[in-house]
UniProtKB/Swiss-Prot annotation:
Part of the 50S ribosomal subunit. Contacts protein L20. HAMAP family: Ribosomal_bL21 (MF_01363). Keywords: Ribonucleoprotein, Ribosomal protein, RNA-binding, rRNA-binding. This protein binds to 23S rRNA in the presence of protein L20. Disulfide bonds: none annotated. It comes from the Bacteria. This is Large ribosomal subunit protein bL21. GO terms for molecular function: rRNA binding; structural constituent of ribosome. InterPro entries: bL21-like, bL21-like_sf, Ribosomal_bL21, Ribosomal_bL21_CS. It comes from Haemophilus influenzae (strain ATCC 51907 / DSM 11121 / KW20 / Rd). GO terms for cellular component: cytoplasm; ribonucleoprotein complex; ribosome. GO terms for biological process: translation.
Amino acid sequence: MYAVFQSGGKQHRVSEGQVVRLEKLELATGATVEFDSXLMVVNGEDVKIGAPVVAGAKVVAEVVAQGRGEKVKIVKFRRRKHSRKQQGHRQWFTEVKITGIQA
């Protein structure tokens, strides 16, 4: 059984027991979160596709960790001008473990 749900402007395909990195959620470690925006739920041959969401479907998860991703370097280089600008960015994320899918 797997489901596709939406969180942080992105869609995630998950199954039970899987650990997923999402955009940062303001929750404490160990907290339980429910995602009601389930776009699709598949249970064997039974496929439910929402328009836009599946009614009554939700994905339940537990917050495992909060953290920051790998550094992305931004470089602006102006040729022949002896000018260069460098900047870095690390995006915050929330790591959750999927504990249940209900349809």
